[in-house]
């Protein structure tokens, strides 16, 4: 039986290890990044050399060995159940005993950047955090350079010289506050009666404790807004109390309480509890505050346990001196309050500080006021304030250390001049924000540091030491064993770290499978011996593994070693693959070179008068003008999409590089811009030279065009060639800048609209040479043929190929992808992998965006998956979200009305809480129609021409591949149904069936899909399940290889137990727990060298087409692999690369 297994492994030495193909035979995955049985392949880890570690890693490894006991004791005392233990720089220094401040800064900053945002930050995407990251990155780069420079000079020293502590700037200088401010922070622990002002600050409730004697009190409040007096009369006859408050400028407030019933007077020391509400809660509390809920009782005095006088009196000076933090202490109102017995209850008093004078310790506000949210700029409502009890003629209101900076985060709500004068500029507020943000950011997770150290230790030393280091990654509390809770804690931490999510029952099943494998004695714990025995590889496997690893290293070492013969062979491969592209590029440069030579000779022979007037610069201007005319004409040919689609369907598709039209468009555009600048500069210099020439020379050259001699500025800015020339150069600059990749991705509309300036550019270019200063205009001769083709192409697309279709269904997936389903027009014939242009009139009537169709031509509907990235797609997503909501609510209303629950004529109100520009409810409920233009050809439509095809998609780039896979799957199903029917009828219609449902010579499709999110695999879940179930029933076969690139590779010691448990769970239930698909998802990025080596051997002598749609980095990598592994010898494998261009 063992021999049979070995034979199977040798036969199917597939580095991809497809579970649905080799589930019964393949017991060991030879995929390069790990194997399931070997777990973390420690004994053959390539990172054995200690010199591979950075200097900071070495320092941490040595420090952990020396201070391991102290660090573990600290972790035990601060035990955290979620593997998050935040420490600052000083704690890191004490725990690891790092005395070199320079090394400490470098280590700390490294982990500040690498610490997961979801573990330490609440808003890691805020602009403040982004600015902070940039600052830390800049400082870290400077620190690393200086640190490495110093370390090279001191290689013989065991430690870095302490004199270099001040060599670099401190990252935390922004966190050093004024000494007075630091004293305030120290005193915050002593404050018991505190008030926390939450973020937002429109109004905030202050819970105040009252002694309650009457439970049912009706309070009638009469407000006098003119005098800012509140009179409350409390008459408790029949449990009715009338309270009269007179609050004048927060001073000398009199409270008269008349009670006919017996009241108990309880004077207790009450603490003002902190309130932590968000903006919405604050507003709700303010609006729901009822004026008839003031209790009638004596308010217990607030115990002044911490003196206000101990705080600095001039906080404004502290702001100006430090520029980073405002004192968190606010003085109290000096209120003279008198009261009688009032019942005790808890009342939430909504107040907003209207004016704050930092020059005085007291609040100088005429009154506590509430600023209305509806009109925060103008409307101010005055609400009564319940009575306070007299306490030494002083009412204390104190703030915690983080309250006042929170107020300053929204300074626009305060309208007082005194407050505005205390904060002189927004820059100081930004500094305060930045310092507060940095205080949150400047901590690291101790578990991240320790895990990284043990990860490095697992790569050095003996096998025993490596396994010990791996064991300590899980036994972080040094118990000597791994309990179920410890393992669950580690797995939860790793799943969050890798962006994975599991249900609770899945995690429990996962742990059960791991303990079933590792816990040999079934005692509920995994000790070191059990852990070691499971990871130890027997001697036979070691020898075999060493041989395999040696062979692979030999292959890897030979990669990139080019002899003279190999270099020549590489050139031949490049010419074979890129022959047509190189031919047209060479032809392009040859034509431009010929134009340069002919223009030079023509000027030298026919424009001697112009040379005499303008100088030698005429040569530059005329050569550049000739290049502009040629390139401006042929660039139109690269914009004829319909023409390229027609060429793709003919036999000439291999002669013209139609897949490279974007490359030629950019090349011609660059040439046009350079020639335009040379032409402009040449004419400016020439005109300056012409000013020094006598009149006879000037009129001898330009006599027909000028009756009076103009100045140089008049020739430049007051002539038709000058004005049109500067406008054209402006158009080119705008189009070039807005065509940059960063702008196209962030704001496609700018790129799209700016490119329509080419219409004005051509009009001005025709007018530019009509005056004929040097020679008659000739651009129209170059323009007529390309302009004709472009006009026909554009007209054909505009009048013949534009369709208005109705969207039948749409699905919004995870706020990232929109799935549109619309009807297929009768004359809309397309091939799998082609794309179309979509226009949504409700969003924009002018914008057309390209999207690949993910449906098969055999279907009567068209499917399109749109990724939400730019402004247009975001507007579309918001509009469809509202439309979906309106439809659901309308359907609910119709269902209720059919059940006669609502009376006839009832109005059904739909609340619209989303923000979108003036959406009409009637339009939202009407059928959804869009305009489509196309189809247009793409490289993916060639996929069915080869026997072996490799499809690679990244993210939403899988769309053309999904169309191909769906088309292949449907054709196989149709052929299978036809084969089961009448054989005579099948023979008669064989040609028709082959044309419609034929798959050509295609034998197998190798599909690769790379994603950074486990939920992204659900976009085409039904298609993948159908293919995995029926994909190998007959030819062509389809193999699926999905990769989650965000997570660590499965051989990583940090996740090997997680991966192993998931593998056991997959074998038990037949579904991948991360994707719920019936095949295993690989972790990490694919190793393309191993994959191409495997295909090169298995399909020797065949041609393999590689189609890619994804990031430019992935396309470039695959392109290089195709070039390298293509063998031009007889019997060699040839790889042909194709890339999607939109």
UniProtKB/Swiss-Prot annotation:
Keywords attached to this entry: Calcium, Coiled coil, Electron transport, FAD, Flavoprotein, Heme, Iron, Membrane, Metal-binding, NADP, Oxidoreductase, Repeat, Transmembrane, Transmembrane helix, Transport
Region (Disordered): 135-166, 208-298
Protein's GO biological process: defense response; defense response to bacterium; sorocarp development; sporulation resulting in formation of a cellular spore; superoxide anion generation
Signal peptide interval: none
Enzyme Commission code(s) on record: 1.-.-.-
Any one Pfam family match given in the protein's UniProt record, by short name: EF-hand_7
Record's compositionally biased regions (Low complexity): 148-157, 211-275, 283-298
Phenotype of gene-disrupted mutants: Prevents formation of fruiting bodies.
InterPro entries (UniProt xref): Cyt_b245_heavy_chain, EF-hand-dom_pair, EF_Hand_1_Ca_BS, EF_hand_dom, FAD-bd_8, FAD-bd_FR_type, Fe3_Rdtase_TM_dom, Fe_red_NAD-bd_6
Molecular function GO labels: calcium ion binding; flavin adenine dinucleotide binding; heme binding; superoxide-generating NAD(P)H oxidase activity
Binding site for FAD: 849-855
Membrane topology recorded in Swiss-Prot or TrEMBL: Multi-pass membrane protein
Positions bound to heme: 665, 679, 755, 768
Compartment list: Membrane
Record-linked CDD domains: EFh, NOX_Duox_like_FAD_NADP
A Gene Ontology cellular-component term: plasma membrane
Residue ranges that the Swiss-Prot or TrEMBL entry lists as coiled coil: 172-246
Compositional bias segments (type: Basic residues): 135-147
The Ferric oxidoreductase domain, residue ranges: 622-766
Needed cofactors: FAD
Matches recorded under PANTHER family: NADPH OXIDASE, SUPEROXIDE-GENERATING NADPH OXIDASE HEAVY CHAIN SUBUNIT C
Protein task: Critical component of the membrane-bound oxidase that generates superoxide. It is the terminal component of a respiratory chain that transfers single electrons from cytoplasmic NADPH across the plasma membrane to molecular oxygen on the exterior.
Quaternary structure (record): Composed of a heavy chain and a light chain.
Name of the featured protein: Superoxide-generating NADPH oxidase heavy chain subunit C
Source species of the chain: Dictyostelium discoideum (Social amoeba)
């Amino acid at each position: 039986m063992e021999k049979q297994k070995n034979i199977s492994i040798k036969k199917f030495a597939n580095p991809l290890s497809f579970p649905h193909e080799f589930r019964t035979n393949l017991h060991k995955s030879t995929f390069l990044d790990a194997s399931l049985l070997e777990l973390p392949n420690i004994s053959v880890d390539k990172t054995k050399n200690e010199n591979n570690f950075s200097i900071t890693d070495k320092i941490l490894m040595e420090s952990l060995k020396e201070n391991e006991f102290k660090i573990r004791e600290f972790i035990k005392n601060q035990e955290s159940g979620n593997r998050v233990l935040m420490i600052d720089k000083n704690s890191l220094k004490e725990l690891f005993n790092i005395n070199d401040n320079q090394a400490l800064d470098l280590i700390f900053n490294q982990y500040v950047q690498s610490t997961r945002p979801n573990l330490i930050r609440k808003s890691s995407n805020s602009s403040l955090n982004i600015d902070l990251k940039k600052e830390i990155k800049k400082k870290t780069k400077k620190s690393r350079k200086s640190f490495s420079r110093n370390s090279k000079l001191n290689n013989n020293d065991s430690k870095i010289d302490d004199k270099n502590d001040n060599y670099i700037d401190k990252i935390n200088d922004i966190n050093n506050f004024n000494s007075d401010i630091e004293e305030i922070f120290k005193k915050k622990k002593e404050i018991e009666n505190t008030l926390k002002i939450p973020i937002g600050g429109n109004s905030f409730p202050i819970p105040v404790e009252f002694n309650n004697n009457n439970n049912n009190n009706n309070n009638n409040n009469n407000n006098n807004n003119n005098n800012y007096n509140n009179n409350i009369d409390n008459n408790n006859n029949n449990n009715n109390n009338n309270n009269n408050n007179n609050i004048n400028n927060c001073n000398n407030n009199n409270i008269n309480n008349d009670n006919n019933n017996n009241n108990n007077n309880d004077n207790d020391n009450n603490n003002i509890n902190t309130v932590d509400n968000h903006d919405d809660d604050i507003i709700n509390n303010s609006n729901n505050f009822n004026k008839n809920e003031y209790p009638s009782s004596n308010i217990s005095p607030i115990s002044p346990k911490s003196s206000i006088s101990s705080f600095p009196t001039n906080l404004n000076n502290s702001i100006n001196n430090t520029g980073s933090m405002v004192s968190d202490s606010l003085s109290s109102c000096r209120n003279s309050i008198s009261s009688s017995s009032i019942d005790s209850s808890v009342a939430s008093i909504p107040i907003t500080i209207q004016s704050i004078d930092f020059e005085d310790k007291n609040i100088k506000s005429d009154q506590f006021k509430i600023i209305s949210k509806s009109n925060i700029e103008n409307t101010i409502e005055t609400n009564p304030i319940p009575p306070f009890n007299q306490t030494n003629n002083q009412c204390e209101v104190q703030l915690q250390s983080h309250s006042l900076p929170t107020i300053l985060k929204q300074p626009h709500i305060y309208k007082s001049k005194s407050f505005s004068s205390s904060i002189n500029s927004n820059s100081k507020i930004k500094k305060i924000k930045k310092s507060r943000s940095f205080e949150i950011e400047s901590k690291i997770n101790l578990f991240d540091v320790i895990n990284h150290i043990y990860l490095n230790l697992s790569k050095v030393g003996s096998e025993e030491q490596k396994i010990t280091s791996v064991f300590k990654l899980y036994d972080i509390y040094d118990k000597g064993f791994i309990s179920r809770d410890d393992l669950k804690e580690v797995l939860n931490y790793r799943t969050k770290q890798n962006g994975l999510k599991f249900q609770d029952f899945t995690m429990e099943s996962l742990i059960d499978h791991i303990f079933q494998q590792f816990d040999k004695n079934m005692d509920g714990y995994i000790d070191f011996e059990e852990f070691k025995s499971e990871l130890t590889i027997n001697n036979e496997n070691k020898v075999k593994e060493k041989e395999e690893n040696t062979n692979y290293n030999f292959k890897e070492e030979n990669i990139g070693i080019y002899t003279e013969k190999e270099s020549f062979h590489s050139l031949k491969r490049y010419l074979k693959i890129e022959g047509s592209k190189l031919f047209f590029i060479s032809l392009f440069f040859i034509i431009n070179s010929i134009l340069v030579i002919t223009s030079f000779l023509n000027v030298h022979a026919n424009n001697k008068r112009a040379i005499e007037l303008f100088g030698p610069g005429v040569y530059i201007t005329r050569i550049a003008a000739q290049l502009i005319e040629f390139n401006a004409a042929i660039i139109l040919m690269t914009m004829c999409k319909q023409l390229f689609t027609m060429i793709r369907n003919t036999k000439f598709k291999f002669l013209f590089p139609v897949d490279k039209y974007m490359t030629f468009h950019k090349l011609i555009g660059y040439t046009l811009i350079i020639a335009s600048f040379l032409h402009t500069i040449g004419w400016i210099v020439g005109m300056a030279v012409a000013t020094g020439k006598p009149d006879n020379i000037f009129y001898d050259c330009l006599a027909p065009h000028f009756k009076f001699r103009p100045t140089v500025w008049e020739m430049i800015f007051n002539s038709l060639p000058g004005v049109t020339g500067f406008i054209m150069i402006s158009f080119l600059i705008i189009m070039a800048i807005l065509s940059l990749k960063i702008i196209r991705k962030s704001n496609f509309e700018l790129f799209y609209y700016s490119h329509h300036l080419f219409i004005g550019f051509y009009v001005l270019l025709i007018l530019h040479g009509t005056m004929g200063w040097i020679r008659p205009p000739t651009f129209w001769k170059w323009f007529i043929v390309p302009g004709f083709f472009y006009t026909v192409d554009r007209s054909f697309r505009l009048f013949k190929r534009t369709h208005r279709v109705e969207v039948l269904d749409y699905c919004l997936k995870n706020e990232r992808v929109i799935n549109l389903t619309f009807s297929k027009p009768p004359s809309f014939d397309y091939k799998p992998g082609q794309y179309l242009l979509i226009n949504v009139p409700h969003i924009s009537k002018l914008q057309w965006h390209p999207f690949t169709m993910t449906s098969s031509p055999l279907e009567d509907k068209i499917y399109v998956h749109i990724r939400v990235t730019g402004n247009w797609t975001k507007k579309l997503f918001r509009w469809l979200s509202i439309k979906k909501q309106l439809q659901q609510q309308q359907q609910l209303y119709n269902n209720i009305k059919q059940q006669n629950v609502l009376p006839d004529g009832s109005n059904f109100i739909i609340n619209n809480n989303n923000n979108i520009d003036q959406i009409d409810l009637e339009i939202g409920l009407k059928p959804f129609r869009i305009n489509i233009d196309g189809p247009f050809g793409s490289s993916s439509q060639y996929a069915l021409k080869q026997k072996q095809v490799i499809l690679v998609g990244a993210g939403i780039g899988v769309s053309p591949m999904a169309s191909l896979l769906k088309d292949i799957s449907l054709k196989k199903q149709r052929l299978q149904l036809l084969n089961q029917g009448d054989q005579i009828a099948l023979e008669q219609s064989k040609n028709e069936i082959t044309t419609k449902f034929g798959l050509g010579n295609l034998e197998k499709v190798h599909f690769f899909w790379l994603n950074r999110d486990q939920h992204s695999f659900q976009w085409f879940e039904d298609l993948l399940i159908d293919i995995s179930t029926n994909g190998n029933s007959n030819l062509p076969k389809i193999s699926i290889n999905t990769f989650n690139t965000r997570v660590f590779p499965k051989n990583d010691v940090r996740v090997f137990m997680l991966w192993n448990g998931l593998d056991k769970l997959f074998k038990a239930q037949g579904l991948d727990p991360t994707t719920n698909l019936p095949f295993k998802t690989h972790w990490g990025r694919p190793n393309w060298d191993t994959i191409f080596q495997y295909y090169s051997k298995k399909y020797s002598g065949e041609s393999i087409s590689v189609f890619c749609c994804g990031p430019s980095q992935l396309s470039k990598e695959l392109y290089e692999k195709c070039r390298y592994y293509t063998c031009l010898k007889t019997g060699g494998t040839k790889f042909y690369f194709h890339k999607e261009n939109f």
